[in-house]
Amino acid sequence: MMSVVKGRLLGLGVGPGDPELITLKALRLLRAAPVVGYFVAKGKKGNAFGIIEAHLDQAQVRLPLVYPVTTEKLEPPLCYETIISDFYDTAAEQLAAHLDAGRDVAVICEGDPFFYGSYMYLHDRLATRYESEVVPGVCSMLGGAAVLGAPLVYRNQSLSVLSGVLPEEELRRRLADADAAVVMKLGRNFDKVRRVLVELGLERRALYVERATMANQRIVPLERVEPMASPYFSLIVVPGDKWQGGAGGE
């Protein structure tokens, strides 16, 4: 009896939201994949799936990976880390069933798979068992800088990418030391982040955008953002000071 050649695991970055920002390579592999997996909240279609839906044909298997309805703050004996780890274990085995049957599986990921992408957790579980390939995508901070018209770093400057979930003192220290910064994962952390920016005198350089490159993108002055209304898909760009050697003259 001949053994079945296992399928390939593909992690495809599909860009920050604008469907035209998917790469040619990701699109080619997506169209050729028998199975397409995508992360989604219960009852939702999902942003990543919305980006690529028009490129799929009826023969391709759609495999939604539905996040558990939970929160990071749970009462004992429940634990967010355990629940989400179990979810990724189960999702990985769903993919493995197709891979073992010889079917390639493309897992789509908004932005870039290895930049805060949920695909990473499947890659950690499966890449040692199956042939895999990761296709990079345009990540949200680059989409954000583009729509804001804000060059991130000049010449020898360094860029710090920070998570809004950092403790306030740690966030303050890192922003104070940064030539330029992008703060991700705002949501309910927005008020803390804005407070730190004001304390450091960075609020005038700081630029805020929600859902960069998506159809419902919003660019709002930092002082006018409602803290409780800041969505997960929002970020703040603090560009580096302009390099005078590149400044144009009159």
UniProtKB/Swiss-Prot annotation:
Pathway: Cofactor biosynthesis; adenosylcobalamin biosynthesis; cob(II)yrinate a,c-diamide from precorrin-2 (aerobic route): step 1/10. Keywords: Cobalamin biosynthesis, Methyltransferase, S-adenosyl-L-methionine, Transferase. It holds the Pfam family TP_methylase. Signal peptide: none annotated. InterPro entries: 4pyrrol_Mease, 4pyrrol_Methylase_sf, 4pyrrole_Mease_sub1, 4pyrrole_Mease_sub2, CobI/CbiL, CobI/CbiL/CobIJ_dom. It catalyses: precorrin-2 + S-adenosyl-L-methionine = precorrin-3A + S-adenosyl-L-homocysteine + H(+). Homodimer. PANTHER family: COBALT-PRECORRIN-2 C(20)-METHYLTRANSFERASE. This is Precorrin-2 C(20)-methyltransferase. It comes from Pseudomonas aeruginosa (strain ATCC 15692 / DSM 22644 / CIP 104116 / JCM 14847 / LMG 12228 / 1C / PRS 101 / PAO1).
